[in-house]
Amino acid sequence: MSQTRPTRAEPPETRADVGAATRADLIAAGRRLFGQRGYDGASIRAITREAGTNLGAVTYHFKSKRGLYAAVLEQGLRPIAARVDAAVRSEGTSLDRMLRVVEAYFEHFEEHPDLPHLLLQEVAAGKQPPDVVLEIIRGVKEAIAGLQVEGIADGSVRAGHPVLTALSVMSQPIYLALVAPLLRTVGPVDLAHPSMRRLALEHTLAFVRAGLTPARNEIHR
């Protein structure tokens, strides 16, 4: 007769586990409601109701609604900053790596289509983003601007203002992702469709390549 081994009881959730889960629920709820209603339109009451937490949870975990908003944006931006960093550190000429930055943005916005609107709604309203957002954006800007400087040295990128070049490269995928709903109506360009999304990526890569490749008479100056 076989003996059944006693099952080991699952360890109870610790207070830290519960706190981390609550924090994650609040960030997810905040991301949904900030995206739908904007910062001013998303109340703490609505966010905690959406997250299934008590009203004081936002203050406990984030100090304020602004603190939660900063955490939401940081969660969205850190991964794209990491992707850009990986592209910048990859092999190839500066132009090759600049094009990989564009691809990184397209890939991230395909996975997180809400992010451009979430990020830029405060900017469009004339408000200053949270400090952590500015820190991440500065880091990305400096990484891409560094490619411009390297590209001038290796001959793969034409001379130009490094910061303006970085902003131009970033703006292409951000703008397309931001206006995607409008493009479906006036295009008709449906960036949710894989073939159209691929076409948009190839078009943007060609556009950036043409803008950054030095003319023949510039290469040996």
Model-derived segments and spans:
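Amphipathic alpha-helical linker/stalk segments
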Residues: 70-100, 135, 144-147
